[in-house]
Amino acid sequence: MKSAPFVSPNFLERVAEPGSPFHRDYLAYQRREITRAELIRQLPHVAMLGDSVCMGIHISSPWSTFWRAHTCRGKNWFLHRDAPRETCSIAKTLESITPLVAIECAGVGALVDHEYSRQDLFRRILGTRNFSAQVSDLLRAFRLPDLILIAIGHNNVDWAWRCPPNDFVEPHERLKRLSEDLRQNYRRDLRRLLERARTQQRRVAIVIYGLINFGSYFKGREAAEHLRESDTTLYPRLEMTYKYFISFHPTYRRNLIRLASMVNKKLHAMVEELNREFVHQTEHIQLRYSDALATADLGRAELLHPIDGWHASVEGHNVLANAAVSDLAPSLEFLGIGDSHRPKPR
């Protein structure tokens, strides 16, 4: 499912201020030298590519889950339209600095995939767009975003799914193979973004977030499981997790944590490799690996959704947003988004 770009509602009021970096563009718009769409293109564009970790989703009945998967845009830690006060998304934080255009590309159940691999029936029903499709969406857009945030790969660490019996006994080689497959597929599509960025006449910053801290996360999950043991009305869909993500079963968690750690090392090395190939030769591209999500403390039950005890609660979304934003300063500085973009006090 594709999403429409979100434009800061008060952008015209803000760019009309004489101190705005976009005031000259606003005057051109007032003189009808450029259109409203052309004015919007001058604003910083921020995109989020990712999976369910980036989305406001939880599992319940099949029909409700299907409906939610198709309506959950703009209800997460990247972008929350009409957000309640207790929810502070990345887009909302950046809006305090500058009016912007936010583009949410993440997909429920999304995988780091091979471009020509066939999706399973469940993901086709949900309208899932895997990493290759999300990248293709950005490349087809009229304008490549200035800041591209990527947090994907969590669905690729379900190592027990379709696992041969022998690999349950000795899983190390399987974990190595899965982490390497993810790296190769990730690298292929990231290179497509970098190739496009190299042709741009302006700066582009890309942040690759490592997978979340599963060791900490499972402490929160265990706390939720203990609460459900004492009160079965809590987390009513908690056991459904195992139907969709086999490796969340307690028996398989240790190796899931191992695999996620291996993936993060691969992603870090991949970024260093691509920096040598692209960034060191092209001054207007910045590519960074961030461990902000990989080190965030997710070890509390209240960070999990009260229905499935799997996806993030409102408080969980805030923790993820705060972690992700905490490591954006180098990218914002590279793009020139900072004090000069802050609205003047009234």
PLM segments and residue spans:
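Substrate-gating cap/lid alpha-helix
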Residues: 217-288, 314
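Conserved SGNH/GDSL esterase-like catalytic core that processes O-acyl groups on lipids
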Residues: 62-188
